[in-house]
A protein has these predicted regions:
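Generic secondary-structure signature for well-ordered alpha-helical cores
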Residues: 74, 78, 109-112, 116, ...
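Active-site histidine-anchored catalytic micro-motif
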Residues: 17-27, 31-33, 41, 95-104, ...
């Protein structure tokens, strides 16, 4: 499939550029609970002056691509940000349709009221679903395009796990996806989007071409690190940037959305309306991706083997270890509250273990009511909404520390961002400490543990509810060879063949190993 769009506007003379700023950012897992209005309110849902104030903050609550875009625009010359609306939620289930309809209508109204504009910047994940629509990202972009007209530049930044659709690329003038995983280049991508916007304003239309492949690599196989196939492909794509080619984005996609736009996408943006150059390169790179598909393999460690490794790590002389509970990753729609690994570690008597972060608002509230030093029976998942995976578990515990959960990211993906876990508590269950939080999220930064008084030097095994983003922030705790991705059940399992697919286009590799594709 090949899709394209053009868009251009003359550069204004003698005045500041007026750039509309908006965003809709969520990654949706088909099998996770519906994401409601409250899910966005817990993370970020602001508009107008409030959004403008965040853009101006040194440590904004916004995603770093927004800060990077704003900084690059300011450095390039006079500009006036026109804040519209920014809605961000933790990865979860399909978005409530009523909320999404209201969001789109609000952005449309704000766009009309903001006229005249010179361009629009969108901060997007690109893998959203709603309860009634499998391509809300494309719908939103199309509605924005309809308001501003065919010639105004619209530039957007995406997660590299975006599920790209024709409607998405058709509405855009430039497409920029992250090139790191863990995602540490959000700010740089925002800066790049600003450069492309200036290029399009000065030189004319941008062209976006996309080639989709019947290939859904597991999330754990999409690590961008030395020696990985994804790193090789992204590096190859970057060698082709230059001349008419503004950007090459290689998007592995998010299979757990289970929708017809799932699949690896090669997206190329070219300047000067050079559609031929963009399409030719997209097809060439797609051929290379397809030839390398067999190298995207997920390597999981059996639970018993992982627990044994933790027991050994807790003995004198044991080396630090990270166990990644990848099947319960809040960063892909997991609840962050499965207990299989926790129970196994406690039962085995493992020492020096810290599990972070476990989402259980009721348990956090009870710990706050009890106070530091209190001993009580910790009842995990007492009112679980996920009886399949988030099973109840009770154990004697002691409250070690309490916090309001507000932290400023220090390293990796959320460095410099002010975020909140809500009321949080550090509990001790024998040799296992558990960081319990109220607002669901994955472990991304040491600050999430340090606000609870944790000294990582006292930890022998760190259990993370995360798929991979922790690697960018905890690289000094344990080297890659001491990270085990544990094979447990959960909503975000990378064992794709175990999932009840209903909307995934078939055949698709690796679900169907005989899937075929040709550039012709």
């Amino acid at each position: 499939m090949s899709v394209s769009n053009t868009g251009a506007a003359p550069r204004p003379q003698g005045r500041a550029l007026r750039i509309g700023i908006c965003g809709f950012f969520i990654e949706c897992n088909r099998w996770s609970p519906v994401t409601t209005r409250e899910g966005f309110a817990d993370a970020l849902d602001i508009s107008g002056a409030a959004l403008g104030a965040e853009l101006a903050r040194e440590q904004p609550r916004l995603l770093p691509d927004c800060a990077g875009f704003a900084a690059a625009m300011k450095a390039a010359g006079p500009w006036q940000p026109v804040p519209l609306r920014m809605a961000v939620a933790q990865p979860g289930g399909p978005v409530d349709q009523g909320y999404f309809d209201e969001l789109v209508a609000d952005i449309e109204a704000r766009l009309r009221a903001a006229a005249p504009l010179d361009a629009v910047f969108i901060s997007s994940h690109g893998a959203a679903l709603t309860t009634e629509c499998d391509d809300p990202d494309g719908l939103l972009f199309a509605r924005i395009r309809a308001v501003v007209g065919p010639d105004m530049p619209i530039v957007a930044v995406f997660d590299l796990h975006t599920n790209v659709s024709m409607a998405m690329t058709k509405a855009l003038s430039a497409f920029v996806a992250y090139r790191t995983n863990p995602h540490t280049d959000l700010r740089a991508c925002g800066e790049e989007a600003a450069r492309h916007l200036h290029t399009l304003l000065a030189h004319g239309p941008g062209v976006v071409e996309c080639v989709k492949l019947p290939f859904v690599p597991p999330a754990t196989a999409q690590l961008v690190a030395p020696g990985t196939p994804y790193a090789e492909l992204i590096a190859l794509g970057q060698t082709r940037v230059g001349g008419p080619i503004l950007n090459v984005s290689l998007c592995g996609g998010f299979a757990l959305a289970d929708c017809d736009k799932c699949g690896f996408a090669v997206v190329v943006t070219a300047r000067d309306g050079d559609r031929r150059a963009a399409k030719t390169l997209a097809l060439e790179l797609a051929n290379t991706v397809w030839a390398m598909r067999g190298r995207f393999v997920s390597l999981l460690t059996p639970l018993a083997q992982a627990v044994h490794a933790a027991v050994v790590a807790g003995r004198p002389g044991g080396e630090p270890l990270i166990l990644a509970d990848v099947a319960d990753n809040p960063g892909a729609g997991g609840g962050g509250n499965t207990v299989m690994l926790l129970v196994a570690l406690v039962t085995a008597g493992a020492q020096g273990v810290l599990l972070g972060v476990f989402t259980d608002p009721e348990l956090a509230q009870e710990a706050h009511a009890a106070g530091v030093g209190a001993a009580f029976t910790a009842r995990f998942n007492r009112h679980s909404a996920d009886p399949q995976f988030a099973l109840p578990y009770s154990h004697d515990a002691r409250v070690l520390a309490l916090s309001d959960g507000v932290f400023v990211g220090q390293r990796g993906m959320v460095k410099g961002s002010t975020l909140s876990m809500g009321p949080s508590a550090l509990l001790e269950l024998g040799g296992v400490r558990v960081a319990v939080i109220s607002i669901r999220q994955q472990l991304l930064d040491p600050a999430q543990l340090e606000v609870l008084g944790v000294d990582l030097a006292t930890v022998r095994t760190l259990v993370v509810k995360s798929r991979g983003h922790f690697r960018a922030a905890f690289d000094t705790f344990a080297p890659p060879g001491r990270i085990l991705e544990v094979d447990c059940p959960g909503l975000t399992t990378p064992n794709l063949k175990t999932l009840p697919w209903t909307r995934m286009p078939r055949p698709v590799y690796p679900l169907d190993e005989d899937a075929v594709w040709s550039a012709g």
